[in-house]
Regions:
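Structured, non-membrane catalytic/scaffold regions adjacent to prosthetic-group chemistry
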Residues: 3-208
Length: 208
């Protein structure tokens, strides 16, 4: 979107492009130029006319936007590296969407109402996140990838993007963000995946 702020990913120090790229890849990962498609279930095909996004705390609905209303919120473009728990990394991926900070501001919230959040997606997928990992420009609801509307197989029409954690935390087909007083496991976390998922510490599974 024209006029949107742009944040570029780390470009490395002097010493050669290969060395710079290697420094951006967490241990145990390999770089791919493809964009593998991995999902916990079938790919939902949600029409934008039927799409909405909400913020919730307890039994209270804090804010809700239609697709058109969400498109009108401040948009941010970023270029980041992403890292999947299945050991692939993709460098310099370009995304555009609405940061969680902008969502809170649009909802009239000076601060998040609780320290944790659970994104909820079409297909009943969930994952848990500390709010500290979603603020300060660290996370967004992404609507576009590579300058194009986000394809359904990659989470479109909208997915969460939390690029500093393993990519299962970047929930596809996201529809709601539920704030929580206490941390709760999401879909994969309930099946033994790590509750946090830091790729630089190889936190793939519980106990890592």
């Amino acid at each position: 979107m024209s006029g949107a702020p742009v944040s570029r990913g780390f470009r490395g120090r002097r010493g050669g492009a290969d060395a710079a790229a290697a420094a951006r890849v967490p241990p145990g990962q390999h770089v791919t130029t493809d964009f593998p498609v991995l999902s916990a279930g079938p790919t939902p095909r949600t029409r934008v006319e039927d799409w909405s996004f909400a913020l919730q705390f307890g039994g209270s609905l804090l804010a809700k936007w239609s697709w058109a209303e969400f498109q009108a919120l401040p948009q941010t473009r970023i270029t980041v590296d992403i890292h999947c728990v299945t050991k692939w990394s993709k460098l310099d991926t370009e995304w555009e969407g609405v940061t969680v900070d902008a969502l809170l501001a649009a909802a009239g919230l000076d601060a998040p109402p609780a320290p944790f959040a659970m994104p909820h997606s079409d297909g009943a997928y969930t994952t848990n996140l500390p709010l500290a990992d979603m603020l300060g420009g660290k996370a967004m609801v992404a609507l576009r990838y590579g300058g194009q509307p986000l394809a359904p197989e990659h989470g479109g029409p909208a997915r969460l993007l939390v690029p500093h954690l393993y990519f299962w935390k970047s929930a596809k087909w996201v529809r709601r963000l539920r704030f929580m007083e206490r941390d709760e496991p999401g879909f994969w976390e309930s099946l033994g995946y790590h509750t946090y998922g830091d790729p630089w510490r190889e936190q793939r599974y519980e106990g890592d």
